[in-house]
């Protein structure tokens, strides 16, 4: 999506500036998923070494017992949200020398990217909800992502949750961060 594409662009730029090897990017999904097409377009534009991992519903279902063991949770929402990270982590650990994975986690919480947040009555409540989600994020998204990826010997990185970036972004007056009924999600990002 938008979040991981932005991270890929920034990391790719860093690779080029420091003469590092070509950046490897990955996307995962079911056959025909539009996100896979978008990821391929971004990778082509950036010039990364891209791999699309196409899975079946059966692949996702078969992974559930191992995902539960890795994330140490039976919570349905947590398990469902972890399967993709777990499967892509497994694929990368088996097919690449990579040890660090950058992802877009935290962007929705920081920038109000969840659909329900468009219903906030005003920019003050919007800001309050973003801050509430960020306060608790280490107990759900970050922990879930870390466990599902690190279970394959990989190290996840979440640039959108970098303390300096979060502090900077939240210092922008909330009236500029809140779009209300706008169709443009995460317009500042």
Q: PLM features: residue spans?
A:
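ATP-dependent adenylate-handling active sites, centered on carboxylate activation for C-N bond formation
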Residues: 2-189
């Amino acid at each position: 999506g938008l979040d991981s594409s932005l991270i890929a662009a920034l990391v790719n730029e860093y690779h080029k500036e420091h003469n590092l090897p070509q950046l490897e990017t990955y996307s995962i999904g079911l056959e025909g998923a539009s996100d896979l097409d978008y990821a391929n377009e971004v990778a082509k534009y950036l010039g990364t070494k891209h791999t699309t991992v196409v899975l079946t519903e059966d692949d996702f279902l078969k992974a559930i017992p191992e995902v539960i063991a890795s994330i140490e949770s039976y919570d349905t929402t947590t398990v469902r949200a972890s399967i993709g990270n777990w499967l892509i982590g497994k694929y990368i650990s088996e097919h690449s020398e990579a040890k660090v994975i950058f992802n877009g986690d935290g962007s929705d919480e920081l920038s109000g990217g969840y659909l329900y947040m468009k219903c906030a009555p005003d920019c003050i409540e919007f800001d309050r909800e973003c801050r509430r989600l960020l306060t608790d994020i280490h107990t759900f998204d970050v922990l879930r992502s870390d466990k599902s990826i690190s279970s394959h010997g990989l190290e996840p990185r979440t640039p959108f949750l970098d303390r300096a970036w979060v502090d900077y972004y939240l210092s922008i007056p909330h009236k500029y961060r809140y779009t209300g009924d706008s169709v443009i999600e995460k317009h500042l990002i």
